[in-house]
Amino acid sequence: MIRLGAPQSLVLLTLLIAAVLRCQGQDAQEAGSCLQNGQRYKDKDVWKPSSCRICVCDTGNVLCDDIICEDPDCLNPEIPFGECCPICPADLATASGKLGPKGQKGEPGDIRDIIGPRGPPGPQGPAGEQGPRGDRGDKGEKGAPGPRGRDGEPGTPGNPGPAGPPGPPGPPGLSAGNFAAQMAGGYDEKAGGAQMGVMQGPMGPMGPRGPPGPAGAPGPQGFQGNPGEPGEPGVSGPMGPRGPPGPAGKPGDDGEAGKPGKSGERGLPGPQGARGFPGTPGLPGVKGHRGYPGLDGAKGEAGAPGVKGESGSPGENGSPGPMGPRGLPGERGRTGPAGAAGARGNDGQPGPAGPPGPVGPAGGPGFPGAPGAKGEAGPTGARGPEGAQGSRGEPGNPGSPGPAGASGNPGTDGIPGAKGSAGAPGIAGAPGFPGPRGPPGPQGATGPLGPKGQAGEPGIAGFKGDQGPKGETGPAGPQGAPGPAGEEGKRGARGEPGGAGPIGPPGERGAPGNRGFPGQDGLAGPKGAPGERGPSGLTGPKGANGDPGRPGEPGLPGARGLTGRPGDAGPQGKVGPSGAPGEDGRPGPPGPQGARGQPGVMGFPGPKGANGEPGKAGEKGLAGAPGLRGLPGKDGETGAAGPPGPSGPAGERGEQGAPGPSGFQGLPGPPGPPGEGGKQGDQGIPGEAGAPGLVGPRGERGFPGERGSPGAQGLQGPRGLPGTPGTDGPKGAAGPDGPPGAQGPPGLQGMPGERGAAGIAGPKGDRGDVGEKGPEGAPGKDGGRGLTGPIGPPGPAGANGEKGEVGPPGPSGSTGARGAPGERGETGPPGPAGFAGPPGADGQPGAKGDQGEAGQKGDAGAPGPQGPSGAPGPQGPTGVTGPKGARGAQGPPGATGFPGAAGRVGPPGANGNPGPAGPPGPAGKDGPKGVRGDSGPPGRAGDPGLQGPAGAPGEKGEPGDDGPSGLDGPPGPQGLAGQRGIVGLPGQRGERGFPGLPGPSGEPGKQGAPGASGDRGPPGPVGPPGLTGPAGEPGREGSPGADGPPGRDGAAGVKGDRGETGALGAPGAPGPPGSPGPAGPTGKQGDRGEAGAQGPMGPSGPAGARGIAGPQGPRGDKGESGEQGERGLKGHRGFTGLQGLPGPPGPSGDQGASGPAGPSGPRGPPGPVGPSGKDGSNGIPGPIGPPGPRGRSGETGPVGPPGSPGPPGPPGPPGPGIDMSAFAGLGQREKGPDPMQYMRADEADSTLRQHDVEVDATLKSLNNQIESIRSPDGSRKNPARTCQDLKLCHPEWKSGDYWIDPNQGCTLDAMKVFCNMETGETCVYPNPATVPRKNWWSSKSKEKKHIWFGETMNGGFHFSYGDGNLAPNTANVQMTFLRLLSTEGSQNITYHCKNSIAYLDEAAGNLKKALLIQGSNDVEMRAEGNSRFTYTALKDGCTKHTGKWGKTVIEYRSQKTSRLPIIDIAPMDIGGAEQEFGVDIGPVCFL
């Protein structure tokens, strides 16, 4: 583009115009001329087709460019008429005075448009055809003077013009001069004076430029262009009409046995069955009408204050867990072809801020900062809740009398006084006459729902309904991730051109194409850069010598140079993003024992241990030292208002106030008297039966019906042909550990252990009594053959054999097995904490501790039975008048009035005193999971719970360290001696076997040593409330309550007999074992025990050197036992023998010293109530207690004497009018209670009414929240648990998308599903929902086998489900819960095929090539076989190879919800170049 400042633009134009003038004399048709818009221009001609565009003819090429203006440096620039660039108005100012010297040539004026200033551009019209060339126009009028240009360089000397007559002096003009007139001095087309030999005169002024001529004729037709590249294949057209039937095939082989026939007709109903178990409790009934508010209950007795718990010490913060290991590197990508080096682009705009990086590890603690400046006082806090009323203060001293006040103004009229108390009841009048019969009462309320009727007989099965019409095509699923590039497909047939799509984004720059044929002349392009200087024209006649010119401007830029050598290598690029993680490798061999990991996350709390023995009460601790003085507390909240001060003097009367805001809506008026009930209407005559209605339109296809009852057992089919062996399945996950097997026989004797350290020499035992002579044993039988020893180590390698001949080349091998496991990985991070193990068995009892000190005073005994009430005493004398009592508490509220309309929510009231505990409400649903709080300080240990039922046997623990030797058991019978095998070398490790069948329960293992105490885990989430447990035992003794007020002295009771000793109470539950006490002092040597039974045979010592065999002597009698020899060396440690039977109990040892007092045991259950004790002596009266709570109003006392009449009150304000018609009937009563008394009795205090409105609003809001929890609405904020729940709560809602949260808790992991409200099914969408249609698998092997799409095919994937926005594992967790909450699941998938069999092979007439599908628990479902693992085909369009796309719809239903959803599919009939497939995955639905 040419970029010109307003003033500089003239310089370039002057040059260009000069070039024009040089060539004006040449022939118009000479070579190198240009044709544009029907007008021919000579080589090097310059012209402006529009005010902001300039063109030059360069050896036959038209080069045009836009003039780019620079902004002038002034406030209000203006664009002169016909110009392109704005200039400052100062440049337009006229200069007065004489005509100045002639300026340099200016830019040619543009006189094309004299209409007005430039308008805004209009919308682009369609391009018109080129018009025919117009005639040359007349010369245009003189253009408006252009702005003054800068001094141009001297032009090339022009041809001398004819001499003009001298002109008269001109008028004063613009300072720029009339450059149009100056330009007229050049030659135009008709000026040829130099060639005619006319004498040259001075150059005349240049004439104005003529208007443009009419448009030229259209250019010649261009050559035919190359054919375009073939278009993209069009979208598949709709399926064509069904072709004509083919010729009849050969008769097929005998088919396989047919499927079982339809169910037979329904049998007669069976006999009445035995009564069933009680049904599960019914659903809660419909919410009843809101009851009227009940009367206020009596105030409950104050509960005993609970013992204050000890505050636990706060736990230490756990150390941060180790950072997870880095993921495995993905496979290395294939190297792409090197791209051509691109030119450096312009710097882009700075990109948007990237997402925040991952949170870095926490930095080390910084140094403590200097104390900041004192902050400004904060804003006054909101008023805190009103504190509980303080205890009444001591009465103050009377104040000194104040000065007499000035007499006040008369006060305003008081409010009318409250109605006086009711007078004494009058004497009963005589009975009245019976009244007239009353009008019928209003309609009674509907009775409660009747009990549920018994279930009816099952109905006869209905007939199968028609198949519904095909549903509408579902919405397109979300676009899947781009698959891997497929192999190049065959060239498709030429598609019809599609409609024009929207303009796509610009593609990358393609490689240059071959040179095309020349096209038609296009529209004028944007102005090009000035071309190179053309070749010199023919030499003209020599002109006269001109004035020497100034040195010329630098020439136009030269041609582009050759491409330079490649630059140096650029700087290292940024590290690319991590590749996608590679497929999981097979598990490597187990790594070496890693270093001990950091302590794992705290496990879940183990089950509650058995109750320990009750400890003794500990001593009371000493009082702690006083703590340091605390920092001054924060300013307290504003205290409650003080008591009202004495009345001030009355102020002057204020001005009339503005009207107050409208009050709350008043309470509803008293109900009117009931209207008379209408008479009972007569029964209407039954109408005639209507004519049958027209047949309705065909309904939409119904949703799949519920699963029908199973059909009758079909006949046994003939045995099917043996199936082809399936491919090896993937290695199964390790099965769960079976229960421990029965105790195996003792193993072979182990290798000798290292020699143990010498034990402490035991005291020498007493010599045992001589044992009786045993009977002679029979010689033992030959032992059975010993077990085969393990295989020996491999022998040494043999010598190399001779080299064999070269064999023939083998067939192409199948895909190799997976490679060897990679090198051992680094030690993994510590695994998550396991669940807590079962509680260890009780430890050995510790030595008995010392006698503890006396315990604290025991609990008070249960109160004795109530004695009979004494007779009332005689009336005492009247006491002295007491001091005036404190102001009584507010009386009890009257009966609740009818509820008024809800007022606006008032400000929150002060906190009321807590009411008595209500009965426990039904358990609410779990609320949304709160944000995890900080760990609280550990609570105090709870009281031990009741003994739980025995837990399931735990897994066998590692054997603990050996316990102390048990007492020797009696010897077992002599076993048969086996031949001792040699100890074999260990065999090579076998492959992992399949899990065995569960063995019988093993005997319990040895007692393990108690494990180290784990760190305290964070509190688990609050579980759902458990069932109400049995009543707990009484708590510990409470701290003594404040002294109550002294009771009235009772009459002294008669002294009772002494009661009998009560029955012994049930023993308390054993407490937890105390920690072992310190060892007591050694007791005195006990008496010698009786000889113990003979112990079992000790392990054999090491074999001695073999002696020479002596001759066999006769069997001698058993000799007497010899003297005890010296202690031999310790033999090798034998294997632990079988557990001996427990020995007889030894004699009790001496009483050990008392151990220290154990912790206090749980309180035992209360014993039976003992008989009353004797009356104690009267106690000293206690101190006067604080005044008790205000008692209930007493009964109305007897009527007092009438008081003296009071002074008359001021007249009250006029009352509102009342419509007495409502009460007209009330005045006509003769007797009976005042009917208005109920209206008056419940007039609420105005303050109470204000309070009630706020309470009502709060209750209403709470009620709404609770209602939304009890009856969720399926929104994201308030998701349901399943669609079945939604259907139960809102049966009228329509099917559609809703949110569910099966695992409850926090709603952030809720997922959107489709709820079928007709059936209650919950349907989860797959993500993605389609497998693109293409050739996924190529194989040259003739052997066909099933190939799993997600596991084996390149680019395949396992199907996943749920919202793609959720964290990866969230949907799996939610699906697990959804499966648990459901009893049946179903899913459809559609297999799109091209030359691939999906279900039935029509040619072979069997299902051998049918797909396999894999459920989420890795079970494979097939087309035939066990009916529990077979799927059905709803539609089968893939039965033969046709070269066209077809589809088969497969459905799988099961009541084993763990098998759904489908996660993989394995076709068999694939692998050829023409064989393609794709899959549409339907949603999985659970009910």
UniProtKB/Swiss-Prot annotation:
Annotated stretches, region: Triple-helical region: 201-1214
Modified sites of kind 5-hydroxylysine: 190, 287, 299, 308, 374, 608, 620
Skewed-composition ranges (Basic and acidic residues): 104-115, 132-153, 251-265, 764-775, 1115-1129
Residues in Fibrillar collagen NC1 domain copies: 1253-1487
Gly residues bias spans: 360-369
Post-translational modification: Contains mostly 4-hydroxyproline. Prolines at the third position of the tripeptide repeating unit (G-X-P) are 4-hydroxylated in some or all of the chains.
Cell compartments where the protein resides: Secreted, Extracellular space, Extracellular matrix
Site (Cleavage): 181-182, 1241-1242
Disulfide bonds: 1283-1315, 1323-1485, 1393-1438
Annotated binding of Ca(2+), by residue: 1301, 1303-1304, 1306, 1309
Residues with glycosylation annotation: 190, 287, 299, 308, 374, 608, 620
Region: Nonhelical region (C-terminal), residue numbers: 1215-1241
Residue numbers covered by the propeptide annotation in the UniProt entry: 26-181
Positions carrying 3-hydroxyproline: 670, 907, 1144, 1186, 1201, 1207, 1213
Swiss-Prot/TrEMBL induction comment: Induced by mechanical load in chondocytes.
Molecular function in Gene Ontology: extracellular matrix structural constituent; identical protein binding; metal ion binding; MHC class II protein binding; platelet-derived growth factor binding; protein homodimerization activity; proteoglycan binding
Position of the signal peptide: 1-25
Region (Disordered): 96-179, 191-1237
Domain of life: Eukaryota
Quaternary structure and interacting proteins, as annotated: Homotrimers of alpha 1(II) chains.
Disease / disorder: Defects in Col2a1 are the cause of a phenotype resembling human spondyloepiphyseal dysplasia congenita (sedc). Homozygous sedc mice can be identified at birth by their small size and shortened trunk. Adults have shortened noses, dysplastic vertebrae, femora and tibias, and retinoschisis and hearing loss.
Annotated family: Belongs to the fibrillar collagen family.
Notes concerning its domains: The C-terminal propeptide, also known as COLFI domain, have crucial roles in tissue growth and repair by controlling both the intracellular assembly of procollagen molecules and the extracellular assembly of collagen fibrils. It binds a calcium ion which is essential for its function.
Protein's UniProt name: Collagen alpha-1(II) chain
Organism this protein belongs to: Mus musculus (Mouse)
Taxonomic lineage from the root: Eukaryota, Metazoa, Chordata, Craniata, Vertebrata
Gene designation: Col2a1
